[in-house]
Amino acid sequence: MMKNLTLEHIAAACHGTYYGSEEKKSQCIEAVTTDSRKVERGCLFVPIVGARADGHKFIDQVMKQGALATLSERPLGEVDFPYIQVESSLQAVKDLAAYYLEQLQIPVVGITGSVGKTSTKEMIAAVLEQKFQVLKTLGNFNNELGLPLTVFRLREEDEIAVLEMGISDFGEMHRLASIAQPNTCVITNIGTCHLENLGDRDGVLKAKTEVFDHLKPDATVILNGDDDKLVTVKEVQGRRPIYFGLNEEFPLYADEIESKGLKGIACRIHTPKGTFSVVV
């Protein structure tokens, strides 16, 4: 069950107007969905207006299926269920995700980069799962709708969130990172993806590092020191980032790298707290 997220809280977080009975205003939702085919009893339905479909046409259907309430960008008139009218469903779902994550007060590892985000997310989550209850991004739910939906999967028992953030244009990272507000930020590399919007690799660097504007105080920043663009980042929040790579001058580096074929890649990892061998 989601933690203490009442319809009253939702209306305030979304800057929306609540319509419905006072009794239901204090009820907590069980989940949030944008997919009318995946409605759960007690959930909040968020109708997204897309290029090919308008989620508003499914509102009556999902309410009959047991949804507790719905958002709506337009007045619904006299209806027998509670709803919250908002200016934009997409903006509302982002605002609500930021509010919900803030209420949970759990550490967030935010991961971005041109390539390798998903593999890095999986490895970080696998390590953390040895000791903590971890929620991680599933599939490619790393954009302005996918990230909020990932956040809504968090439950009270979760101890750490590992969130992937993918972008294709300037400003997107600002919007994603304002939701995630990472305690730890990892950037894998600066490549040549989305140059149609970002221009060149310097543009990619600028867009990716928008994340720095939304880090929690005293956040840890971990960068690929072998990347010629990321190594130019000398300071974040007044502190030097932690670099990793193949250079033994970095605090975290790998050597003795050897392919084991289908069994993976063997290497030796050097850290400030010791050296160990792994097969990935």
Residue ranges and their predicted role:
Residues 1-95:
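N-terminal leader/targeting and accessory segments in enzymes
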Residues 11-12, 92-225, 229-239:
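Phosphate-binding loop of NTP-binding sites
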Residues 16, 68, 81, 106, ...:
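A structural micro-motif
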Residues 20, 47, 72, 85-86, ...:
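Structural signal for conserved beta-strand scaffold positions within catalytic alpha/beta enzyme cores
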Residues 34-35, 47-49, 72, 136-138, ...:
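Thr-Gly-centered strand-to-loop micro-motif
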